[in-house]
Amino acid sequence: LVGNLRDVDGARIDRLDAVLLTHEHADQCHGIDDLRALVIRHRQRMPVHMDQVTADIVGRRFDYCFEGAGAYPAILDKKVDLEIGQVIRIDGVGGPVNILPLGQDHGSIPSLGFRIGTFAYCNDVVRLPEETLERLGGLDSFVVDALRYTAHPTHASVSQALGWIDRIKPRRS
């Protein structure tokens, strides 16, 4: 699991089947160029899944990655297919993976969390709507944002995260 795209090189990742963007903030996507090495190695464009709001912003900001520019070919395949509560399937070398996008509040903007089987990932979140909390039952593992001990306008505090954990009762968090 890569927390943001700038971590790809440092994590020594040899292969990715797809990228899921939670939202358009720089800490999530300002490393998208680092996918170029993987794309060249595997000789196929990288599918990048996102919601419409993210696609509008990231598509403009990194148009050269999605559309190509001059002598540089496009390296990414923009997939605007993430909708809250609608499962998408990603086929990869390890087999198909079903991913459920989850709605969450990141303060000034919405962001997405993801549930994959009995695993859920909810970063960059300050509030989880009731609908999302209901979709988080029965988890083995829950990765959740907790920026600091005190309140923050765009990130959960430790006490908020512990409250969600107490409510949904994952085996690990």
Predicted regions mapped to residue ranges:
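Structural motif
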Residues: 18, 118-121, 141, 172
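Cap/insert and terminal regions of metallo-dependent hydrolase folds
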Residues: 127-173
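Active-site environment of divalent metal-dependent phosphoester hydrolases
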Residues: 25-29, 57, 107-108, 127-130, ...
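Core dinuclear metal-dependent hydrolase active-site scaffold
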Residues: 1-14, 77-134
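Active-site flanking residues adjacent to catalytic metal/cofactor-binding acidic residues
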Residues: 22, 123, 144
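Active-site neighborhood of divalent metal-dependent phosphoester bond hydrolases
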Residues: 42-46, 54-80
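Active-site metal-binding motif and surrounding structural segment of the metallo-beta-lactamase
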Residues: 1-50, 139-141
